Amino acid sequence: MNSPDEHNGRRRFLQFSAAALASAAASPSLWAFSKIQPIEDPLKDYPYRDWEDLYRKEWTWDSVGVMTHSNGCVAGCAWNVFVKNGIPMREEQISKYPQLPGIPDMNPRGCQKGAVYCSWSKQPDHIKWPLKRVGERGERKWKRISWDEALTEIADKIIDTTVKRGPGNIYIPKRPFAVITNTAYTRMTKLLGAISPDATSMTGDLYTGIQTVRVPASTVSTFDDWFTSDLILMWHKNPIVTRIPDAHFLMEARYNGARLVNISADYNPSSIHSDLFVPVTSGTDSHLAAALVNVLIAGKHYKADYLKEQTALPFLVRTDNGKFLREKDFKADGSDQVFYVWDTKAGKAVLAPGSMGSKDKTLKLGTIDPALEGNFETHGIKVTTVFERLKAEITPYTPEATQATTGVHPSVVRQLAGWIAECKALRILDGYNNQKHFDGFQCGRLKILILTLIGHHGTTGSIDTTFEGWRLEGNSELGTVKGKPGRSVSAVLAQWVWGEQYQRSKDYFNDAQLREELGFGVDEMESMRKESEANGWMPNWQSIKEPVVSITGGINMFATSNGYQHLRDNFLKRCELNVVVDFRLNSGAMYADIVLPAAENTEKLDIRETSVTRFIHAFGQPVKPMYERKTDWQIMVALAAKIQERAKARGIARVDDPEIKSGIDFDKIYDEFTMNGKVVTDEQAVRFVMDNSKALGPGTYEEVMKNGFVAVGPSAGKTGPVPKDKPYRPFTVNVTDKKPYGTLTGRLQFYVDHDWFQRLGATVPKPQYRGGVLGPKKYPFVRNSPHARWGVHSFARTEQWMLRHQRGEPDVRMSPKAMAAKGIKDGDMVRIFNDSGEFFAVVKAMPALPDNMLFTEHGWEQYQYKNMTHYNMVSSELINPLELVGGYGHIKYTSGGFNPNRIFYETTVDVEKA
């Protein structure tokens, strides 16, 4: 029964409702849409409707600017950014790229990570103002401080460290993919005499094996050149997932008649678009490549004339000691950089032109007809050719002999070799996976040998590794300080020492197993590292300096590196002030002492150069930096100003730096950084780079900031000119103009007679050991960390829309068969572990994986894992001694080119339900 109160309440509600309806009917401004009005002109006479106008205004903008996205991505894509009330609201691809004749256009460029950037930039993990740690490192307890407080503390610590400990104890790792942003740290490193690590080796992305063959190793065609190929090998490359802006060129090439081949341990998404899938066992790719070379040579599927001119395969090698026959063998004052070939016309050994020591800087042979094959004698010295040595050492690697190692049936190898032999334009898309295996060094040499044997290198084909970047003289000048070279080191070696990774690897790997497979163990790797440093082959700064002050710019150092927790703890005990500059609180920032807020991509004024397209792209700064953020250039300018101010106040001027024949001028470091006021602002810095680069020049700044992109001129190519009417392809001038390569022999060099290469049996490209994963066999799974679809490294890994397109948390992937054997179901939380560490993740069934493989897509942050673990907490690494070699012509320490690569895909693990 209803109570009186309930009855009265209902009656009052009805009364008020009736009154409200009556009032609305009487008011001309309320419920106007319900009135019946005569409409004579349907286009003009409809009443104005306020509620509809809300939607109209939602799609109006105060301004539209241009930008690209750079953090870890090599693509280069132009976007419009729509701004309202000073806030970037959304972005849209710019589809105005010009089309080359006969080539599909690049419109539009972009991916889903770029499309959500404006949304992601507003999330709470993006930094608004300077922060200082108030708890223990890693506790994530902060207080807000002013820029002046932050810069003063950093400046004083830099000065104190340099004065008390000596120059070279400042460490500045960086890897932001934008010209001015990156160069800001480079310039500061030079002025402080600081240590700068090779960030490419830190991530395991060097192509050191290929660097022994050509210089530079890291080169690509512009990706529209894929369309011109008729055979494309995607070797541990998954462009459908990782090259979203460019994958259409593969599909268009296929429609144009090209064959696509996917070579991978897993049946990845690119495999379904392939004409042939080659399932190679993890860590055995060099054996597969050797089998292909074996078939090509045995069937004489090679271009002899090309090999005679473009390669060192006809060069003579002594049979007594395995060394090149050199001019110094016959003359007391002869060069050790001048070599011989056997001239079949003259019937004798003659000097080959084009080498480093040759006066004739050309590959033109003139009347010389070098012998590719044969055994000869000259002046009492028995010699043979490099090609003969190669044939002899590659003979055992037949498709039948390698099947047990690679898991690839001989018929598949022969089918693929046949396609290679008959194709007109071979393209090898060389992914980042192989280089992270011990097998990767020799495999790189073998891959480029395949391309070279059929005469496609620098002609109709290419082996595309990673982008080389365009030649911008202005950028080089901005990053150079006369008389102040700074200190460059291998990131792997720096972390091997400071992070005590040597001990971690020694504890993890089975020494007896390594000695059986490789002939040496971790102790020998360490002794060879020390020997290399003592010989001056590799820089030794990590052995004589400490990272007392670390300023990390745009790189997630611990999460990026092997042995996360081991590196972190040992590095931080050496580091007294850890500064992180980034636009968000990533895993590395958790352990910072001071965090400086860098500008978002929408807040930058900068340019992006990447040679996968013929364009420079703009960060057009659609909005000014919000809150208290600053661009990286402005942060370094402000730091330089504060150092100079504090030095003058403390009466400190110059500190000599005799180790690098330089000095640090603290009292004028701001003047030096800004070139006495020429490059104070971001715009001044960008204009300086563009105006002083031949491939761009005056006027291009306005063009790139208006359109979002600008085409580079012919001189931008580092290995040849950029044509106006067709895609760029590297190393063409070596074929067309007979220009020597930057190698010791001046040619594509497939023989290295360095003592260490001889000792390790690696003079020619061939497998370095029996193949397979080198991790302890007591753990049944090999762990790989492929690039992800829903993030670019850690970029966008926390973005809400990207998380909704996947499991929303870190996962590991296993084959259903392996899961069943472990009693694990899809969606279970599992523990992945070995002697080095553990991490937890949700398991996801992936039938495309081999039963012994475990995938953990990289880029996840530590704080996204259960118990604050991380996938790199189980990894350990090895050093390939071949990558420690130096003092041999072109084979020497080169940042971004040649130094020890991160080899950590030899890690094995086990899995159990958590």
From Swiss-Prot:
Catalytic activity: chlorate + AH2 = chlorite + A + H2O
GO molecular function, one term: chlorate reductase activity
SUPFAM superfamilies the UniProt entry points to: ADC-like, Formate dehydrogenase/DMSO reductase, domains 1-3
Disulfide topology: none
UniProtKB keywords: 4Fe-4S, Iron, Iron-sulfur, Metal-binding, Molybdenum, Oxidoreductase, Periplasm, Signal
Swiss-Prot/TrEMBL cofactor(s): [4Fe-4S] cluster; Mo-bis(molybdopterin guanine dinucleotide)
The enzyme's E.C. designation: 1.97.1.1
GO cellular component, one term: periplasmic space
Binding site for Mo-bis(molybdopterin guanine dinucleotide): 205
Practical use: Has potential use in bioremediation of waste sites contaminated with chlorate, such as pulp and paper industry wastewater.
Signal peptide residue numbers: 1-32
Binding residues for [4Fe-4S] cluster: 69, 73, 77, 111
Cofactor note: Binds 1 [4Fe-4S] cluster. Binds 1 molybdenum-bis(molybdopterin guanine dinucleotide) (Mo-bis-MGD) cofactor per subunit.
Keyword Signal among UniProt keywords: yes
Job description of the protein: Terminal reductase that allows anaerobic growth on chlorate as the sole respiratory oxidant.
Subunit structure: Heterotrimer of alpha, beta and gamma subunits.
Protein name, as recorded: Chlorate reductase subunit alpha
